[in-house]
């Protein structure tokens, strides 16, 4: 998808690790497995005669529909991961994401209060982390998921240093 309309000119985006697709797929599989299992319970209960409602077509249709939605997400996940990027500029950090609804967020270094790194079990197993930026604004939800752990640590130190330098200049 073209992004020229929202991308600032002259920016070279750094992309997150392709291994982040695996993290998203594991999360997808666990969540959807539980969802389809729960939505299939009425089908099981109707088939063994415990319930008379819902009708068989509805008991089959609801989990089938959710399974189709889950498979659609399966197709989208690799594209969503490829759309995530970031760029460091002199005074701010740019973060982009989205396929259909694209977004570019600009976080000035002087507004950063602290930079946090987190990693769940799947991320840790793949050597990845998520970098979160906390600013003075409660509404800021800036983060870069799927970074290699070394890049996340480097970025955390660099952004913290830049934030302190800009904050001291205020």
Predicted regions and their residues:
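N-terminal basic, Ser/Thr-rich segments that initiate or prime the first beta/alpha elements at protein or domain
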Residues: 1-110, 114-170
């Amino acid at each position: 998808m073209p992004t020229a309309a929202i991308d600032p000119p002259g920016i070279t985006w750094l992309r997150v690790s392709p291994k982040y697709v695996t993290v998203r797929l594991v999360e997808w599989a666990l969540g959807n497995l539980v969802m389809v299992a729960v939505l299939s319970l009425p089908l099981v209960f109707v088939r063994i005669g415990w319930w008379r409602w819902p009708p068989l077509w509805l008991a089959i249709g609801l989990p089938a529909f959710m399974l189709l939605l889950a498979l659609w997400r399966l197709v989208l996940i690799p594209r969503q991961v490829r759309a995530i990027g970031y760029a460091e500029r002199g005074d701010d950090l740019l973060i982009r994401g989205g396929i259909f609804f694209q977004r570019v967020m600009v976080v000035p270094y002087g507004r950063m209060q602290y930079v946090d790194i987190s990693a769940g079990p799947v991320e840790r197993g793949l050597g990845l982390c998520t970098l979160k930026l906390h600013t003075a604004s409660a509404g800021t939800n800036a983060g870069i998921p799927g970074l290699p752990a070394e890049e996340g640590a480097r970025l955390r130190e660099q952004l913290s240093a830049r934030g302190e330098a800009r904050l001291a200049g205020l």
